[in-house]
C-alpha cells in the first residue's frame, strides 16, 4: 500500500508500505488546491512510469506525454491571467449566484466533482458537479433563475453545447470553460 501525501510524517504515511511525497508542503488554508493539482500530476507520472515498465508505452510515447505535461505547465500563467479577467468581467453575476452546477463529461467528470468541492469550500454556497448524461436524467429539473451553470469541456461537444443552450433561459447564467481558443462573452477559453 502506497500513499500520495504532502506530509510524509502523517498517520497514513506511517501506516503505508511506501510514501510518495507530492512536494507541495502542508497547505495552510482549508482548501488544498495545490495538493489536488500535485496529486493529479503525480498520478499521471506514475501511470506513465508503470505503462513504460510494463511495455504498454514506448520511449516515443513517454517523451510525447512528458512534453505535453511540460506544455501544460508552461500554459498555467496565461490560464491564470485569462481566468482572472473572466472572473473580473463576470464578478457581479458570480457574486449573486446562489447555487453553482458544474457539468463535465469523460475525464472532466472528476473536474466537475472537484469544482463542487472547491466551490462549496470557498464560495460557501450549494454547489454540485455532474456527469453530462446524469444531469440530463433528472437533476436539470431543479434549475432556476438563481443558478449559475459551468459547462466544462476539453473539446467542443455537441451534447454539452446543446444542454447549455437549453438551460440558458432557465438559469442566471450558463458559462463554458474550455481548453480551446473559441472565446465569447460567456466562455472562458484557456487556449491550451
Q: Model-predicted segments: where are they?
A:
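A SIS-like phosphosugar-recognition module
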Residues: 1-192
Amino acid at each position: 500500500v502506497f500513499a500520495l501525501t504532502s506530509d510524509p510524517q502523517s498517520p497514513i504515511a506511517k501506516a503505508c508500505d511506501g510514501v510518495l511525497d507530492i512536494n507541495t508542503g502542508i497547505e495552510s488554508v482549508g482548501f488544498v488546491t495545490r495538493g489536488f493539482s500535485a496529486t493529479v500530476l503525480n498520478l499521471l507520472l506514475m501511470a506513465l512510469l508503470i505503462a513504460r515498465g510494463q511495455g504498454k508505452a514506448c520511449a516515443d510515447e513517454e517523451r510525447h506525454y512528458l512534453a505535453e505535461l511540460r506544455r501544460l505547465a508552461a500554459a498555467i500563467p496565461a490560464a491564470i491571467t485569462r481566468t482572472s479577467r473572466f472572473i473580473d468581467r463576470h464578478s457581479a453575476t458570480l457574486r449573486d449566484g446562489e447555487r453553482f452546477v458544474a457539468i463535465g463529461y469523460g475525464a472532466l467528470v472528476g473536474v466537475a466533482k472537484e469544482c463542487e468541492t472547491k466551490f462549496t469550500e470557498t464560495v460557501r454556497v450549494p454547489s454540485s458537479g455532474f456527469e453530462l448524461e446524469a444531469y440530463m436524467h433528472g437533476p436539470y429539473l431543479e434549475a432556476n433563475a438563481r443558478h449559475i451553470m459551468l459547462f466544462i469541456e476539453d473539446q467542443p461537444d455537441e451534447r454539452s453545447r446543446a444542454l447549455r443552450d437549453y438551460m440558458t433561459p432557465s438559469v442566471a447564467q450558463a458559462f463554458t470553460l474550455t481548453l480551446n481558443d473559441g472565446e465569447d462573452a460567456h466562455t472562458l477559453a484557456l487556449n491550451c
